[in-house]
Amino acid sequence: LGKYASGMQSGVEWIKREGSIQKDNIQYIYTEDKEQKKVAAAVSSIGIELGFVPDKPILSLMRMDNLVKVSSRTTDNMIEKGVNLGVIMNQASQNFNGSGGGHNIAAGATIPANQMDNFINLVDEMVAYQINNN
């Protein structure tokens, strides 16, 4: 538990310091740090609580060798607007020979590292599509 708590503290400090990278419809944070990878899903949730842009889903992307693990979170407000991260993570990851899925409010994916930028752009477009077609 001590290592996890220390990792969480480090993760919170990291997102407070770095903030999130903003796209039109999503925001994301990225790391290759081993300790931050262990707590990335929780850090995504904390990012929402710490006041990252609340009307944009947040993705935590963690590089692991040739893969990127993605953890995504959103708010009830975004779900009411039509966002379903489980569908987005599933469909977007399959476009890049990855895998993913989950729930409307929290989902994940694993994708090839060399497709990370394309994946982020597709997720951004898919969020816009879901909102505009709700």
Which role fits each region the language model picked out?
Residues S20-N134:
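Glycine-rich, acidic loop segments that terminate in or are immediately followed by a histidine
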Residues L1-Q22:
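Oxyanion-binding "anion nests"
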